[in-house]
């Protein structure tokens, strides 16, 4: 016979588990899961399982803020459980929890911000391909792979990276 999934799980107190087990590119699923478990009266604690090298700054910030808010406003304990890797944004998310659990071998920390892009201008020139850029501002084509970076662009990007790093 087939037993519906909900009927197969005994009633009573439960622990909600939010899994973040890949590079962090979006906060949507984790925040939805956190909200769901926070609303459910039969969920008595929330575990955020982290197995991630980190990822996007904005997505990591959004998850961290939700974890921290639940920690500060809910009676439910929220526990960060680190797997083999919980680095950068994963570490940041864990900081919002009431408790952080890690194994001695967990690779964690590594707070930093990186930006890179290829510069293919010479290759394009060798192929005989020409390109034109029309822009509305001096930095609008910053980061274009078709040209070398200028001193002004490097300073702009370094400031951006430093600002994002300081938000950690």
Feature locations, PLM:
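Small-residue-centered hinge/linker elements
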Residues: 1-77, 85-168
């Amino acid at each position: 016979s087939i037993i519906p999934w909900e009927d197969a799980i005994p009633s009573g107190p439960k622990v909600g588990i939010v899994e973040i087990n890949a590079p962090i590119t979006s906060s949507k699923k984790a925040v939805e899961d956190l909200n769901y478990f926070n609303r459910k009266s039969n969920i008595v604690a929330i575990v955020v399982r982290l197995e991630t090298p980190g990822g996007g700054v904005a997505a990591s910030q959004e998850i961290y803020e939700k974890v921290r808010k639940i920690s500060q406003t809910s009676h439910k304990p929220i526990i960060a459980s680190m797997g083999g890797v919980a680095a950068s944004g994963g570490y940041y998310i864990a900081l919002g929890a009431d408790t952080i659990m890690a194994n001695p071998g967990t690779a964690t920390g590594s707070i930093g911000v990186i930006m890179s892009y290829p510069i293919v201008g010479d290759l394009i020139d060798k192929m005989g391909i020409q390109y034109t850029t029309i822009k509305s501002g001096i930095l609008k084509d910053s980061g274009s792979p078709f040209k070398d970076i200028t001193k002004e662009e490097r300073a702009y990007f370094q400031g951006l990276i430093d600002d994002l790093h300081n938000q950690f």
